[in-house]
Amino acid sequence: MFTSEIGVVEEWLSEFKTLPETSLPNYATNLKDKSSLVTSLYKVIQEPQSELLEPVCHQLFEFYRSGEEQLLRFTLQFLPELMWCYLAVSASRDVHSSGCIEALLLGVYNLEIVDKHGHSKVLSFTIPSLSKPSVYHEPSSIGSMALTESALSQHGLSKVVYSGPHPQREMLTAQNRFEVLTFLLLCYNAALTYMPSVSLQSLCQICSRICVCGYPRQHVRKYRGVSSRIPISSGFMVQMLTGVYFAIYNGEWDLAQKALDDIIYRAQLELYPEPLLVANAIKASLPHGAMKSSKEGTRCIQVEITPTSSRISRNAVTSMSIRGHRWKRHGDTELTGQEELMDITEVDEGFYSRAASSTSQSGLSNSSHNCSNKTSVGKNQRRSGGSKAGAKERETAGESCRDHFARKQTQRAQSENLELLSLKRLTLTSSQSLPKPSSQGLAKTAATVFSKSFEQVSGAPVPRSPSPAIGCVAGADANRFSACSLQEEKLIYVSERTELAVKCQAGQQGPPSISVTLSAE
């Protein structure tokens, strides 16, 4: 070490001893910016025979147990270098030169296994389940797991891994050495995002040295110093891979790649399945080109996350979908029913309008007085209420005009009924049936046109309407009527009304008639 570096370390040691507790947070914040101090401390740790090693280890332990977060992280950044020095000294069997480093490692370990109240810590980790989403997968992207997902989540099949409680250690032995070191490396990995680049570089170099020392690859790497093999555990190698994996994506591509290859090399020699599985998975996921991430940016492991999708499948049966399906089905049914009723109503109205117009025209032949009023049939129906002025005008009409008008109306009624019959045969087939009389069909929606004269009131015989005969059909087809049969019945009814009107004209002058139209809608 140079004299300047020794002076920086000695100044750091003396400064902390005279520092009051109130200014400790400001001191911890400014400490991480002293790069020259960090470099000098690395050199002190790398020289086991240095006189400054013991006070430096003591100072780092005081930082760690102070409770200040910044001072704790400052100590953790030297942890990989301290482990390497301890393992190197242990491999060379020089136990006396590693006493202060061993004490520091034991002190950090004993502080980490207990909480603030002095109780043992129990660390837990929940292994991700395929039924629940994570940063690596979405359950909906795997496939249709509607039933499987709910079943797995309800049964609670997620596996939880526990670590602890860990026992207190007073000294490091060959039996508990890697148990302590593995836990310390776990604590270091928990604070990886706060570690500077110098610490990540030290981690990668130490991982390579530990894995190749005493093996033929040591000559390829040209590592000097320790030439004996350093025993290592499977769990410790897995923790090394965690730190190396982070360093790959945070500016240390070359060193981390080299360390990854050395870890795979050592795991193959030791036949450790856990580090082989993790290391090969990391290597298979690496990009082909070097990662050029900024050392000053945010430190994190880059993971490609699939876009989130809806957890509810489009084909999933829910209460809303069932309710919507019912609404849609009822809406279609009601719409279809309304359309059918409209179709029937249109047919009924067409059938009724023809028959009603012909019947009304034949019934009004006795009360009409002017040939010019023969085209307005609807107005004559409304005006046939029996006003006195209309009655006087009808009494003064000539006999010849009434006979001529009656003959003409009879011919027109017959021609219109024949035309209606031909049209109905085109639109309605003879096989089409009408609903039962109890339902709202054509039999009830059709108009019932009747005309009562003052002669009927006085007791004169009037031919009965043939409409009741329509429903009196024997046999299995009692409720089925064809369009032709209905038209023929209506034609007979119209012809009878026409003959009756002609006979009444010859006997006496026709009194006013009342025409009522009933339609059940």
UniProtKB/Swiss-Prot annotation:
Keywords, ordered alphabetically: Cell membrane, Cytoplasm, Membrane, Phosphoprotein
Residue(s) carrying Phosphoserine: S321, S415, S422, S433, S453, S465
Phosphothreonine modified-residue sites: T306
Subcellular location: Cytoplasm, Cytosol; Cell membrane
Pfam family, one: Hyccin
Main location as per UniProt: cytoplasm
InterPro entries per record: Hyccin
Protein name: Hyccin
